[in-house]
Each structure stands twice: as structure tokens, then as C-alpha cells.
């Protein structure tokens, strides 16, 4: 684990093809995961804050690959940019992701941000490489009934349906994350020089769609451009405030658009 203080400034082709194909051979969902998906329960959101420039992140990246295969989990890889100065500029690092992580730190009362960090359902803060702790946190979050079950309509570029329900007094933020299925990167410099790193569900955009105050909402997503650029999927997250507990979420593959 590598920490970064708030006060500081932000931190072979054939082989790559083989590794990219190995995304299809991920660990299959557990029996509990399959039961959760079949029951129609809202999925658990797992956000990994990571960087290809951090040498403690690859085990967490591999764990997220495993989690991305589970139907009861919305697994997102958010690459931060504050480690870019230490030798390797992460090609997927973004100040948008760094800002989201900092907001979580404030909401959860943390003194600093660090990588690899996993946030489960906007509530639980974990070191992202501690697999057993992460899996236990997912099971704990799955047992907590969410307020909302979101749905997608694929026609016309996509639309998300948020049912009526009880909203927090301050309302809830509706987020849209668009992500790539996976990337394989041969790192040339920095702490991971010489390593080939795999990343799954790499977030490329994270935008606010609006505010939910308890009413039924149908929000057009206009994902045709993202699909044309080869993006793999999207997730809609309804979250108390801006970085509070997650009230509901759903994910959709963009190749399902009509």
C-alpha cells in the first residue's frame, strides 16, 4: 500500500495478446454470487483506485479482474494520476478519478489517499490487495438491502430507469461511468518496469447525470458515441450526496444497445 498526503501535489505484442485473451478465463462466479444474481438483488459496487506506476497495485488489479466476472458485482477500475511523476505515466490515469478518491477520503474521514484502495458500496474502505477482506466486505454489503433496483432500456442509445423510492433529505447523485473491458500494458519505466499489467473495467469517463429526490426517473444516456469508440460497458450509480453510501446501481454492455 502506498499513501499520498492531501497536502502534497498529485502521485511483447504476442505476450500482450495472450494475456488479453486470458480475460476470458477468469474465475467463475461463486455459488453465492450466482444466487444473488438470480434473486434480482441490486449488485454491490466495488471501486478500485489504482495506478500502473505503483508497485503494490498489480495484485489488486488481478483481484478486480476476478470480481469483474461476478454478476452480483459492479467492478470499476479508476486509475489515478498522482503517481505519474515517479517514472511511469499511467495511460488511463485521470484527475477525475483522483478527485473522486479524494471526496471519498473526506466522506470517510481518512487523512490521506492511497493505492491500491477499494471502496465497497461507498461505505467500506479497504486495501485493494487484501483479497479475503475485500470478499468479506462484498458479502457484508450484499446482505444489506439497497433502496433501489435500477433498470436499462437499450433503445435509442440507452436509457436508465430509476424507480420511485425514499431518497435522502439532500437527494442522491446519479452517476454514469463508461468503461473499457480490459487493457494489457507493458510498463517500460518506474516501479513496475518490465512488468505486464492487466486491468479490467477501466473507467474512461465518470459524469453526473442529475439528482434523484425520490421520484421515478427515466434518464436518456446517449451511449451510441461511446459504443462507436469501442467502449465496452457502462454503470449507473445512485449515491447519497456525492460520495456517500450507494443506494443502487446497474451495469450494461454497450453492445446491447439497439
Label each region the model flagged:
Residues 118:
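Ligand-binding face of N-terminal immunoglobulin V-set domains in extracellular IgSF glycoproteins
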Residues 13-28:
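Bacterial N-terminal signal peptides
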Residues 78-81, 121, 155:
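Short loop/turn motifs enriched for small/polar and acidic residues
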Residues 1-10:
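N-terminal secretory signal peptides that target proteins for export/translocation
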Amino acid at each position: 500500500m502506498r499513501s499520498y498526503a492531501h497536502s502534497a501535489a498529485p502521485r511483447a505484442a504476442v505476450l500482450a495478446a495472450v494475456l488479453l485473451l486470458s480475460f476470458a478465463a477468469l474465475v467463475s462466479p461463486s455459488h453465492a454470487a450466482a444466487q444473488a444474481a438470480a434473486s434480482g438483488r441490486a449488485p454491490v459496487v466495488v471501486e478500485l483506485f489504482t495506478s500502473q506506476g505503483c508497485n503494490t497495485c498489480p495484485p489488486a488489479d488481478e483481484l478486480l479482474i476476478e470480481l469483474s466476472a461476478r454478476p452480483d458485482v459492479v467492478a470499476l477500475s479508476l486509475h489515478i494520476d498522482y503517481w505519474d511523476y515517479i517514472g511511469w505515466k499511467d495511460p488511463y490515469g485521470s484527475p477525475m478519478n483522483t478527485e473522486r478518491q479524494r471526496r471519498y477520503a473526506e466522506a470517510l474521514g481518512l487523512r490521506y489517499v492511497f493505492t491500491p484502495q477499494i471502496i465497497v458500496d461507498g461505505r467500506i474502505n479497504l486495501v485493494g490487495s487484501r483479497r479475503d477482506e475485500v470478499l468479506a466486505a462484498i458479502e457484508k454489503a450484499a446482505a444489506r438491502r439497497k433502496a433501489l433496483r435500477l433498470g436499462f432500456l437499450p433503445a435509442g442509445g440507452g436509457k436508465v430507469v430509476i424507480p420511485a423510492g425514499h431518497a435522502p433529505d439532500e437527494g442522491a447523485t446519479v452517476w454514469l461511468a463508461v468503461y473499457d473491458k480490459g487493457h494489457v500494458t507493458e510498463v517500460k519505466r518506474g516501479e513496475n518496469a518490465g512488468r505486464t499489467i492487466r486491468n479490467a473495467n477501466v473507467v474512461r469517463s465518470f459524469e453526473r447525470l442529475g439528482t434523484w429526490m425520490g421520484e421515478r426517473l427515466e434518464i436518456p444516456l446517449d451511449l451510441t458515441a461511446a459504443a462507436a469508440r469501442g467502449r465496452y460497458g457502462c454503470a449507473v450509480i445512485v449515491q447519497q450526496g456525492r460520495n456517500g453510501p450507494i443506494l443502487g446501481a446497474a451495469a450494461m454492455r454497450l453492445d446491447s444497445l439497439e
